[in-house]
A protein has these predicted regions:
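Active-site histidine-anchored catalytic micro-motif
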Residues: 22, 46-49, 66, 79-80, ...
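N-terminal glycine-/serine-/threonine-rich phosphate-binding loop
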Residues: 17-95
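Anionic-ligand-binding alpha/beta catalytic cores of soluble enzymes and soluble regulatory domains
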Residues: 137-210
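Fold-independent oxyanion-binding glycine-rich loops
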Residues: 27-29, 55, 87-90, 103-104, ...
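A conserved acidic, glycine/proline-rich C-terminal tail/linker
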Residues: 200-278
């Protein structure tokens, strides 16, 4: 029995170390330049057994809001011990250091740029550390610093040896809608591959504030009038009868955010919600209760 228990402990320990070699990348580097290749090459040189997963390299330039949304959608499907390198708006300075977020058993390496507050919504259980760096100067800090922090995590270095607990990280409230007596005011936080427009208004918030009331929804100038929570789709093929290709409808997407979609949207033909209606990230989304 003792030998069997030792074997199980050994297997579990090895599984944990395997998980800590999973490293994801979320950047705004695009695919044209050498940056992504250099970053992966550095990681494989430092961590030969690394398993690297691309979340996205097409994040809109400097948009930590978009990066936070994409990582929210992906991280929950990775095992504990996964390391996430966030390479958007990652420049460092004397005033802005490199941070390590420990959240739900996973590690997130990011500059102090507001990402942590956007990603965690200030939920309990988030541990933040200001990482100890001898020199913050680099024209490519994700390559110079984030990769080496990932290496030390994979080597089993305790988090406490990498930095000090930190609570003064930058707070940005882009994800938080404003709630008033007769209205919710939100904004567009993401436009997906199909041109569907994602707001920062969640199903839970809308249910809580609607209290059975009907409402009008406005994505910039486009409106969906006299709706209710129960009438909003939860699948893209669940749209109302009578809608044809090109018509807009409301849906709670996979992450339970309110989204305006276009039936059979294809940006290369008749377009998605964003192109047809001239909607951009940052535009206002409002819900007026009737």
């Amino acid at each position: 029995v003792a030998n069997w228990e030792f074997f199980l402990t050994f297997v579990r320990a090895n599984e944990a170390m395997d998980n800590i070699n999973i490293i994801t990348l979320t950047t705004d580097f695009g695919e044209q330049d050498y940056s992504v290749g250099a970053l992966k090459g550095q990681l494989y040189s430092l961590i030969p057994k690394a398993r690297i997963v691309d979340i996205s390299h097409q994040v809109d330039r400097y948009s930590i809001t978009e990066a936070a949304y994409l990582l929210q959608g992906a991280y929950r499907y990775f095992p504990e011990g996964t390391i996430h390198i966030m390479g958007v708006n990652n420049e460092l300075s004397a005033e802005r250091g490199l941070l390590l977020l420990v959240y739900e058993g996973q590690y997130f390496i990011t500059a102090d740029n507001g990402f942590i507050a956007l990603f965690t919504h200030n939920k309990k259980g988030a541990e933040v550390y200001l990482l100890d760096l001898e020199d913050r100067r680099s024209i490519f800090p994700t390559l110079a610093f984030s990769t080496k922090i990932a290496q030390r995590l994979c080597q089993g270095t305790p988090v406490a040896a990498l930095g000090t607990p930190y609570s003064e990280h930058l707070y940005i409230s882009n994800f938080i809608p404003k709630v008033r007596a007769q209205r919710i005011e939100g904004s567009v936080i993401y436009i997906d591959h199909f041109g569907n427009v994602v707001s920062n208004i969640t199903e839970a918030l809308l249910r809580e504030e609607a209290k059975g009331r009907r409402f009008n929804v406005y994505f910039r100038y486009q409106s969906v009038d006299n709706s209710s929570v129960e009438e909003i789709c939860t699948q893209y093929n669940q749209k109302e009868d009578g809608l044809s290709a090109g018509d807009p409808f409301l849906v709670f997407n996979h992450l339970k955010y309110l989204e305006m979609a276009i039936d059979k949207a294809n940006p290369k033909s008749f377009g998605g919600s964003a192109s047809l209606m001239g909607i951009h990230v940052g535009d206002t989304v409002s819900i007026d209760f009737i």
